[in-house]
Amino acid sequence: MAGTGKTVTRVDLCEAVYQKVGLSRTESSAFVELVLKEITDCLERGETVKLSSFGSFMVRKKGQRIGRNPKTGTEVPISPRRVMVFKPSAILKQRINGQQANGKMNGESAPSEFSAETE
């Protein structure tokens, strides 16, 4: 799934759980649906969902403001609403930029304290 540029769907997530965890396809589907429902329910209640090493989903309240119709330039009131925000963790940011958590690029080996320098 990684690096292909495709959109990952619920079906893809269920298949990954099936392949990697070993649950049946029915159990894998139920598991994915349960996790997504729990995240959704928490967000509906206004709770922050923090997934370690991944990121945080939170609901933010936006007050009423004045917007502008781009075609006519007419001012239009935009009603107050709640919006969902995702803030990726530092670890996720590093991974999508090809770095490991220690700041090294993926594929680089960490320096060994036992390596001998030759001169």
Curated annotation (Swiss-Prot):
It holds the Pfam family Bac_DNA_binding. Residues 96-119 are annotated as: Disordered. Keywords: DNA recombination, DNA-binding, Transcription, Transcription regulation, Translation regulation. GO terms for cellular component: cytosol. It comes from the Bacteria. SUPFAM superfamilies: IHF-like DNA-binding proteins. GO terms for biological process: DNA recombination; positive regulation of metabolic process; regulation of DNA-templated transcription; regulation of translation. GO terms for molecular function: DNA binding; structural constituent of chromatin. The keyword Transcription applies. Heterodimer of an alpha and a beta chain. HAMAP family: IHF_alpha (MF_00380). This protein is one of the two subunits of integration host factor, a specific DNA-binding protein that functions in genetic recombination as well as in transcriptional and translational control. This is Integration host factor subunit alpha. It comes from Bradyrhizobium sp. (strain ORS 278). The lineage of its organism: Bacteria, Pseudomonadati, Pseudomonadota, Alphaproteobacteria, Hyphomicrobiales.
